[in-house]
């Protein structure tokens, strides 16, 4: 009886996993290719004091095309994985190109994107 319950749970988990995978939309070809003639956001490097590790850290801040300091924007934080730093997304992805393309296509609300160095070691390489 115990084996039947385990088999049933595994079968159900497999079925739900297959169903979930089939509903994930695919990205359009060229979504991460720089397009000529579209407005581009700006990327700045900022330095901030980290109270957590007691040292200065860097972060990249992307502001959308047409950014105005007088307007309020939502903020998206893109965090790197273990061993990464604030450049991780730019080294292994193209967030600024993807965001610019989505803005140009009218598919995204303008937002500020922050890519911090979230390493928790005071004297690391970053």
Per-region residue spans from a language model:
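Residue-level signal for beta-strand positions within conserved beta-sheet cores that form or flank
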Residues: 16, 55-57, 109
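Positively charged n-region of N-terminal signal peptides that target proteins for export
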Residues: 1-5
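Bacterial N-terminal signal peptides
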Residues: 7-15
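Short beta-strand element of the alpha/beta-hydrolase
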Residues: 60, 71-83, 113
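A domain-start/cap signature at the N-terminus of enzymes
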Residues: 20-73
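Short, flexible loop/turn elements at secondary-structure junctions
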Residues: 50-52, 65, 83, 117-120
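Hydrophobic alpha-helical membrane-insertion segments, chiefly the h-region
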Residues: 17-18, 82
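Cap/lid segment of the alpha/beta-hydrolase catalytic domain
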Residues: 84-126
């Amino acid at each position: 009886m115990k084996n039947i319950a385990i088999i049933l749970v595994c079968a159900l988990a497999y079925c739900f996993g297959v169903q979930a995978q089939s509903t994930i939309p695919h990205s359009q070809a060229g979504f991460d290719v720089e397009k000529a003639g579209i407005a581009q956001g700006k990327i700045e490097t900022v330095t901030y004091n980290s109270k957590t590790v007691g040292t200065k850290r860097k972060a990249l801040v992307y502001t959308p095309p047409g950014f105005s300091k007088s307007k309020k924007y939502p903020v998206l934080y893109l965090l790197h994985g273990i061993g990464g730093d604030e450049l991780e997304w730019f080294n292994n992805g193209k967030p600024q190109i993807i965001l610019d393309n989505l803005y140009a296509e009218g598919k995204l609300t303008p937002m500020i994107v922050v890519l911090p160095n979230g390493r928790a070691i005071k004297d690391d390489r970053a």
